Amino acid sequence: MLKTVFRILINLLSRVFKTDNISLKFPVSIKAIIIDDNRVLCLKNERDEWDFPGGKIKINEDIEDCLLREVKEETNLNIKNLKSLKPMNLKFNGVQVIVFLFSAEISCDSPIILSYEHTDYSFFLKSEIKDLNMPQYYKNIIVTLI
């Protein structure tokens, strides 16, 4: 049902804004909180912050397909057991962004190969999360998952 509602919303917004690049007008981000052995995978971005793999959804792209694509592009990993978490309405640099979060697991052993978007990666235990340079709302979610 979430997929259907999301697809309808994106289609309506693309008609209203008359653009194929809806992310310019109404940013929507999809993120995977990948858990492996009670540790969560985090990627370090260009702002030296820890983040989750993910990115922007394309027009008419299935939300789960977007997540699989973004995780593969950013980490070389395949994921499984996707579970939708509560969407978040956040502000980044004064811009409102809707973030759809999913928990996930690694589906097979593959080496992590980072894309140009990230400088480092690590798997963190629950006890290590509080000290990370990461938005507090992400920390709160991680603590409830692991």
Q: Whereabouts are the PLM-identified features?
A:
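A short coil-to-beta-strand element that immediately follows conserved catalytic motifs
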Residues: 78-87
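Active-site-adjacent beta-strand/loop module that shapes the phosphate/pyrophosphate-binding cleft
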Residues: 88-111, 122, 145
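NUDIX/MutT-family hydrolases
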Residues: 103, 113-144
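Short loop segments at secondary-structure junctions
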Residues: 37-40, 105-110, 126-128
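Acidic, metal-coordinating catalytic segment for phosphate/diphosphate chemistry
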Residues: 1-31
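Conserved Nudix-box catalytic region and its N-terminal flanking loop in Nudix hydrolases
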Residues: 35-74
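A structural signal for short, well-ordered beta-strand segments
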Residues: 32, 84, 102-104
